[in-house]
């Protein structure tokens, strides 16, 4: 998997890709280029066996302030409807690429996490925050609808319809305490422990059965649109496929030998 990216930071080590936006002096806003490069990177990640998990870090005390006011918001006001639709589809494609990449993604949120930055955290599988984290889906504060990049579909699944409606209608920031109580954040830790906590979670995931983890991520995404009967059948088929895998056999033999299984992702 390539780490020679231009519009964000990326390091790959021990099966974990650690990424972060790289404009800390402006609270890490997204640009047209960083949107597109992140989208393409997560698409490529789906087919890469080297990376087992992803950690998305803050930079300079902030996660992301969302779309850059000067580089994105200003130009959008001059675009045609067709050009605007091309842009909104492209930003949505980033979320689809994150959800479809097959690798668990952990967002480590500190400071400002707003707009598209909040969407990136939302589209992740696990979220860890500092007490200083402020997460805001503030689209209505710039005269836009809250239905951006899948927010109206995904956010209610995480925190509930009423709480999602409050954040999307008001555009206010959700505190770290609220985020943990509502189920948005899996844990809240001191700022000096944030990266280590996220990396520890990623290491545990990376040491697990990675093909099976991919199946779990796929089912978590797909079963929302299935009936209960369809979901149970889909899980039966997914589990039967995993039972054919070598990791299942490794786990069995390790259990019999009273050893810890070493998974290889096949």
Predicted regions: what is each one?
Residues 1-59, 96:
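Conserved CoA-thioester-binding segment of acyl-CoA-metabolizing enzymes
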Residues 111, 126, 166, 170-172, ...:
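Well-ordered beta-strand positions
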Residues 1-6, 253-266:
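Terminal low-complexity tails and localization/encapsulation signals of metabolic enzymes
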Residues 24, 128-133, 185-233, 240-246, ...:
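C-terminal long alpha-helix characteristic of the crotonase
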Residues 94-100, 108, 114-168, 182, ...:
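CoA-thioester-processing core
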Residues 58-96, 143-144, 227:
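Glycine- (often His-adjacent) and acidic-residue-rich active-site loop
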């Amino acid at each position: 998997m390539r780490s020679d990216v231009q519009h964000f930071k990326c390091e790959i080590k021990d099966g974990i890709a650690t990424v972060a936006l790289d404009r800390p002096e402006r609270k890490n806003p997204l640009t047209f280029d960083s949107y597109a490069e992140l989208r393409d990177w997560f698409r490529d990640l789906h087919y890469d066996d080297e990376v087992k998990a992803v950690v998305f870090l803050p930079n300079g005390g902030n996660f992301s302030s969302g779309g850059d006011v000067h580089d994105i918001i200003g130009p959008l006001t001059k675009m045609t409807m067709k050009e605007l639709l091309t842009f909104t589809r492209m930003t949505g494609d980033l979320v689809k690429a994150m959800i479809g990449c097959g690798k668990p993604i952990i967002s480590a949120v500190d400071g400002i996490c707003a707009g598209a930055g909040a969407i990136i955290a939302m589209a992740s599988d696990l979220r860890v925050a500092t007490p200083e984290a402020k997460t805001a889906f503030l689209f209505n504060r710039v005269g836009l609808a809250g239905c951006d990049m899948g927010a109206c579909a995904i956010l209610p699944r995480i925190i509930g319809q009423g709480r999602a409606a409050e954040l999307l209608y008001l555009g206010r920031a959700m505190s770290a305490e609220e985020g943990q109580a509502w189920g948005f954040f899996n844990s809240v830790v001191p700022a000096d422990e944030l990266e280590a906590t996220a990396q520890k979670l990623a290491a545990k995931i990376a040491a697990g059965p990675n093909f099976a983890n991919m199946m779990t991520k796929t089912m978590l995404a797909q079963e929302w649109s299935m009936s209960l009967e369809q979901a149970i059948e889909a899980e039966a088929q997914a589990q039967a496929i995993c039972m054919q895998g070598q990791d299942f056999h490794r786990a069995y033999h390790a259990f019999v030998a009273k050893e810890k299984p070493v998974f290889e992702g096949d």
